[in-house]
């Protein structure tokens, strides 16, 4: 369809789009029809075992961003717009090269909470937008089911005699729900008498924070998924020895519940670019990257794979480099940092209500946030491309200043209007292709042999800018347990507010000299990392005062209303 800069809602643009049958999208991406399992006309799962090798080994472009603000940055929008622009450039070349997208699935909790949707925006969306944002192909339901089946099996084992000597006080594996529901953070189960189970304190996490989700996204195939599920530590016995899913003997049934969900989902952008949307861990409380299986499949079918990692480069991008890239051959060859004039001014102290007013002084103050993210990406041996997601309120003076600043830092920069013009990222695509052709020296931030405590301190000081890390007594006790159980060599997954480099969400810009507070650690032995909980970050979010859900509805014809 023809793009226009006329203001329209994301949902209206999506509903007016003319979609291609999913078989056509698959054919253009080199995915054979026999590998597809249709979910309607425009969605399909892909059986990767039936996709032949193409000889391609696509290079990965990782899209990340500055520290997020309520003003919005447009990372997913840029990811989609960049892939569309790359495909347009490849078509003009006539060389047969192609790009694909690998994205995370939206979580229903944030969709109904603050975000309202997570499929891009404007003329740079993945479609069908409303179906992807709601139940999609049921992957999160399957992950819910596997997670909660494990919880039920643990409690049943205790009730039926407790042969494993499970200590109910030391069960670390929680139930999950794909919803923001603060009332479920701490609960007591098993009440009502001796036939109702064994009473104990429990709690719920949001599904995207669960270890089942992490295992799902890091597994390389079905067998690896089963192996990782078996390695999950769900608690400890009365002798304080760790207990695993394999010890309980239920890794088989949990894998069975996930055998269809593990197949990547194929959809399309508004411009017809193939998109694999699969898995969805948060980057503030989990590792924040889509599934290894989807990214690896995209690399087999495309020359350039555009993917994203959640929130700012201090969270999702760091975890992509230090966690996901260790488990699979998906290391990025180029990195894009998405920024907006509005977000940088907010980091410079401008309230949201005044962001439309031109203010180069505030931009100068707030650019320190972008500067640190650039520096952080360079620590991994990669020179990032900065993409300015343009808004109509951006003044030419502000844009000129930011371009000049980036050039003074030796940073490639492109101004993109992918929201209003779909593939309006031609300059960004050219800069990214140049970055892919430039020499790079990808490296991890730390060696796995370092003790967990030192890894946390290194991330806090080198990436966040902290002066030191303060560990609670509980955290120190957990570190000793981790070392005693031989888990010291696992990478670290920091759980931290997304809004600041610190653990205080109100400290915007690029704070330094602060103390990072680690209150606890959770070994995720199936996923293969240690979660370090900092500050007041929650693994079960709550809804805001005015949830996005209040604007959502369905009309008499069954069309979605209010998604964005």
Curated annotation (Swiss-Prot):
Keywords: ATP-binding, Ligase, Nucleotide-binding, One-carbon metabolism. The keyword Ligase applies. GO terms for molecular function: ATP binding; formate-tetrahydrofolate ligase activity. ATP binds at residues 69-76. PROSITE patterns: FTHFS_1, FTHFS_2. One of its GO terms (biological process) is tetrahydrofolate interconversion. Pfam families: FTHFS (PF01268). It catalyses: (6S)-5,6,7,8-tetrahydrofolate + formate + ATP = (6R)-10-formyltetrahydrofolate + ADP + phosphate. The keyword Ligase applies. Its EC number is 6.3.4.3. It comes from the Bacteria. InterPro entries: Formate_THF_ligase, Formate_THF_ligase_CS, P-loop_NTPase. Pathway: One-carbon metabolism; tetrahydrofolate interconversion. Belongs to the formate--tetrahydrofolate ligase family. This is Formate--tetrahydrofolate ligase. It comes from Renibacterium salmoninarum (strain ATCC 33209 / DSM 20767 / JCM 11484 / NBRC 15589 / NCIMB 2235). The lineage of its organism: Bacteria, Bacillati, Actinomycetota, Actinomycetes, Micrococcales. The gene is fhs.
